[in-house]
Each structure stands twice: as structure tokens, then as C-alpha cells.
Amino acid sequence: MLLGVATLVYNYVRFHSFTDFGYARIPGVLNEPWYNHGIFSYHYIPRQIWEMLWRPWETRAKFPYLAPNAFSSSILWSSPFVLFAFRSGAKDKALKYTCWVAVFVLCILLWIHGNSGGWQFGYRYAMICLPFLFVIMLESSPKKLTPLEWVAYGFSFVANLYATWLFHWTEYMK
């Protein structure tokens, strides 16, 4: 809470507005197509939900035949293990529900932002929610990994390894 208030005061000292974070002051940024309603707008919510949860990797006619979009793709394609957050039960239900509230609030804030991330694979801003999703998954996880979990974790590992290889050691990004 203290850091949030300090940030708002800092904004006021710099820009004479508590809610001005300086993004709109970057030359040309408001001319970018993803900011056609300003930096933050409820108009962006449907697109951002699609980017975060559904946007698939791209199929191509030549190698790499399957590749993540370099500006954004669904977290469910790069890390399907996060689906285990929806498992029922919890060791500490209050903690689990509090984390879900945090994820919901953070997602709303992320979804009203015009840009889905930038040059990366997956949904860049999902990392903001991951600590809470990990707590949720830990709260409702079984004592032993199930075969389905092994598959999901293995797929997530391979997908991220493949995308990292594409981005860093191939001509895909050049």
C-alpha cells in the first residue's frame, strides 16, 4: 500500500497528475495502433483476453513450421500447466480465494492496457499473475504428480525450450 501511494505521489511530483505514469509522453506512442483508445481503456479487454488465453502459435509454410507470435501468444500454449490452478479443493481455502482475487484484479488491470507485451513468446504480462497462480496450484495439488500433470509440465518445458531456441539460436528472429 505504501509503495502504491508513493508511486502516485511520485507521478504527481513529475507530471502534476496522480494517474499519469508518463507512457503517453513517449514521442509517438499514442500513434501506435494498439493505443487507439489511449494507454488504458476498457475497449482493450476482449483483445487482451484473446491474446492472454487463446491466441495460438502460428503455422508457417517453411521452417519453423510452428512458432510463437513474437508479440504475444496464449499462456495456455506456452504453459498449459496453469490450468491446474482450476483444480478444486485447497489446504487453505482463504489463501486460495485471496490469490484468485489478486489474479482477477491483476488481469483486469493488464487487460485494460493497450499493448500485450512486446517482443517475446507467450503473454509477457502473465508473469505478474504467476506467483499467485503457483500458490493456488500448490494449495490444491495432490501429494503426488498425476500422469496428466507430468504431460502438462513436460509439454510446457518443451514448448518453452523450443521457443527459447527459436528466439536465441535461429534465424527466426532476424
Model-derived segments and spans:
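Membrane-proximal envelope and lipid/glycan-remodeling enzymes
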Residues: 1-174
